[in-house]
Protein backbone atom coordinates (compact mmCIF):
# COMPACT_ATOMS: atom_id res chain seq x y z
CA UNK A 1 0.00 0.00 0.00
CA UNK A 2 1.37 3.37 -1.05
CA UNK A 3 0.66 6.90 0.13
CA UNK A 4 2.11 9.91 -1.60
CA UNK A 5 1.66 12.61 1.03
CA UNK A 6 2.02 16.33 0.43
CA UNK A 7 2.01 18.99 3.14
CA UNK A 8 -0.47 21.59 1.94
CA UNK A 9 -1.84 24.96 2.97
CA UNK A 10 -5.01 24.05 1.05
CA UNK A 11 -6.26 21.33 -1.28
CA UNK A 12 -9.49 20.35 -2.97
CA UNK A 13 -10.86 17.68 -5.27
CA UNK A 14 -13.55 18.23 -7.90
CA UNK A 15 -15.71 15.73 -9.77
CA UNK A 16 -17.78 16.93 -12.74
CA UNK A 17 -17.00 20.54 -11.88
CA UNK A 18 -18.23 20.22 -8.28
CA UNK A 19 -15.95 20.36 -5.24
CA UNK A 20 -16.50 17.18 -3.22
CA UNK A 21 -13.59 17.45 -0.78
CA UNK A 22 -11.66 20.42 0.56
CA UNK A 23 -9.16 21.08 3.36
CA UNK A 24 -7.04 23.90 4.71
CA UNK A 25 -3.69 23.16 6.35
CA UNK A 26 -2.91 19.46 6.39
CA UNK A 27 -1.98 16.55 4.17
CA UNK A 28 -3.13 15.57 0.72
CA UNK A 29 -2.89 11.77 0.71
CA UNK A 30 -2.85 10.08 -2.69
CA UNK A 31 -3.49 6.42 -1.91
CA UNK A 32 -2.52 3.47 -4.11
CA UNK A 33 -3.61 -0.08 -3.31
CA UNK A 34 -1.66 -3.09 -4.58
CA UNK A 35 -2.76 -6.72 -5.06
CA UNK A 36 -1.03 -7.99 -1.92
CA UNK A 37 -2.45 -5.29 0.38
CA UNK A 38 -4.74 -6.02 3.32
CA UNK A 39 -6.19 -4.36 6.44
CA UNK A 40 -2.99 -4.92 8.40
CA UNK A 41 -1.04 -2.90 5.84
CA UNK A 42 -3.77 -0.24 5.81
CA UNK A 43 -3.53 0.02 9.63
CA UNK A 44 0.25 0.39 9.43
CA UNK A 45 0.06 3.03 6.69
CA UNK A 46 -2.67 5.01 8.47
CA UNK A 47 -0.55 5.11 11.63
CA UNK A 48 2.45 6.26 9.62
CA UNK A 49 0.50 9.01 7.83
CA UNK A 50 -1.08 10.25 11.07
CA UNK A 51 2.21 10.28 12.97
CA UNK A 52 4.76 11.27 10.31
CA UNK A 53 6.49 14.39 11.63
CA UNK A 54 6.62 16.81 8.71
CA UNK A 55 5.10 19.97 10.19
CA UNK A 56 7.28 22.65 11.73
CA UNK A 57 7.48 23.20 15.48
CA UNK A 58 8.19 26.54 17.21
CA UNK A 59 11.87 26.20 16.21
CA UNK A 60 10.97 25.70 12.53
CA UNK A 61 12.08 22.06 12.71
CA UNK A 62 9.99 19.27 11.13
CA UNK A 63 8.91 17.79 14.42
CA UNK A 64 5.09 17.75 14.49
CA UNK A 65 2.65 15.30 12.95
CA UNK A 66 -0.58 16.36 11.24
CA UNK A 67 -2.58 15.82 14.44
CA UNK A 68 -0.22 17.95 16.55
CA UNK A 69 -0.32 20.63 13.84
CA UNK A 70 -4.15 20.58 14.02
CA UNK A 71 -4.31 19.76 10.33
CA UNK A 72 -6.77 17.93 8.14
CA UNK A 73 -6.52 15.11 5.60
CA UNK A 74 -7.74 14.98 2.02
CA UNK A 75 -7.58 11.32 0.95
CA UNK A 76 -7.79 10.57 -2.78
CA UNK A 77 -7.52 7.14 -4.39
CA UNK A 78 -4.90 6.98 -7.13
CA UNK A 79 -4.39 3.59 -8.74
CA UNK A 80 -1.50 4.90 -10.87
CA UNK A 81 0.74 4.81 -7.78
CA UNK A 82 0.71 1.01 -8.11
CA UNK A 83 2.07 1.18 -11.66
CA UNK A 84 5.14 -0.77 -12.72
CA UNK A 85 7.30 1.65 -14.72
CA UNK A 86 10.44 -0.49 -15.00
CA UNK A 87 9.96 -1.63 -18.60
CA UNK A 88 9.10 0.21 -21.75
CA UNK A 89 7.37 3.53 -22.22
CA UNK A 90 3.90 2.60 -20.99
CA UNK A 91 3.04 1.84 -17.35
CA UNK A 92 1.74 -1.58 -16.38
CA UNK A 93 -0.95 -1.80 -13.73
CA UNK A 94 -0.56 -5.52 -13.05
CA UNK A 95 0.52 -4.79 -9.45
CA UNK A 96 -2.67 -2.84 -8.72
CA UNK A 97 -5.43 -4.34 -6.61
CA UNK A 98 -8.71 -5.33 -8.29
CA UNK A 99 -11.30 -2.53 -7.93
CA UNK A 100 -13.38 -4.28 -5.23
CA UNK A 101 -10.35 -4.84 -2.97
CA UNK A 102 -8.93 -1.39 -3.70
CA UNK A 103 -12.23 0.30 -2.79
CA UNK A 104 -12.62 -1.78 0.37
CA UNK A 105 -9.11 -0.88 1.59
CA UNK A 106 -9.50 2.78 0.54
CA UNK A 107 -12.70 3.06 2.62
CA UNK A 108 -11.06 1.20 5.51
CA UNK A 109 -8.06 3.56 5.43
CA UNK A 110 -10.43 6.55 5.51
CA UNK A 111 -12.24 5.13 8.56
CA UNK A 112 -8.94 4.56 10.39
CA UNK A 113 -7.95 8.20 9.85
CA UNK A 114 -11.37 9.79 10.36
CA UNK A 115 -11.44 8.87 14.02
CA UNK A 116 -8.34 10.98 14.64
CA UNK A 117 -8.87 14.28 12.75
CA UNK A 118 -11.05 15.93 10.08
CA UNK A 119 -10.99 13.99 6.80
CA UNK A 120 -12.29 14.88 3.35
CA UNK A 121 -12.14 12.48 0.42
CA UNK A 122 -12.23 12.08 -3.31
CA UNK A 123 -14.55 9.65 -5.08
CA UNK A 124 -13.23 6.17 -5.75
CA UNK A 125 -12.70 5.38 -9.46
CA UNK A 126 -13.93 8.82 -10.57
CA UNK A 127 -12.18 11.19 -12.95
CA UNK A 128 -11.07 13.85 -10.47
CA UNK A 129 -9.35 17.19 -10.64
CA UNK A 130 -7.12 17.75 -7.62
CA UNK A 131 -5.67 21.16 -6.85
CA UNK A 132 -3.38 22.06 -4.00
CA UNK A 133 -0.87 24.49 -2.63
CA UNK A 134 2.11 22.39 -1.58
CA UNK A 135 3.64 23.98 1.52
CA UNK A 136 7.42 23.79 1.24
CA UNK A 137 7.21 21.93 -1.09
CA UNK A 138 7.10 18.91 1.19
CA UNK A 139 6.25 15.55 -0.41
CA UNK A 140 6.96 12.00 0.80
CA UNK A 141 6.38 8.54 -0.67
CA UNK A 142 5.30 6.10 2.07
CA UNK A 143 5.16 2.40 1.26
CA UNK A 144 4.25 -0.45 3.61
Swiss-Prot record:
* Classification of source organism: Bacteria, Pseudomonadati, Pseudomonadota, Gammaproteobacteria, Pasteurellales
Family the entry assigns: Belongs to the DTD family.
Q: Output the Gene Ontology cellular-component terms.
A: cytoplasm
**Subcellular location(s) per record:** Cytoplasm
Motif Gly-cisPro motif, important for rejection of L-amino acids residues? 136-137
Among HAMAP family, the record links this protein to: Deacylase_Dtd
The EC code for this enzyme is: 3.1.1.96
Query: Major place of localization?
Result: cytoplasm
What SUPFAM superfamilies does the entry give?
Answer: DTD-like
Query: What is the name listed in the Swiss-Prot or TrEMBL entry for this protein?
Result: D-aminoacyl-tRNA deacylase
Q: Name one GO molecular function term.
A: Ser(Gly)-tRNA(Ala) hydrolase activity
Top-level EC class, please? hydrolase
Q: Which InterPro entries match?
A: Daa-tRNA_deacyls_DTD (IPR003732), DTD-like_sf (IPR023509)
Amino acid sequence: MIALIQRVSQAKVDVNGETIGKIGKGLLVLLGVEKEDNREKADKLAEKVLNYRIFSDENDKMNLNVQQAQGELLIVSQFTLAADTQKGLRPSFSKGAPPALANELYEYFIQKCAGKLPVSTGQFAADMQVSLTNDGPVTFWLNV
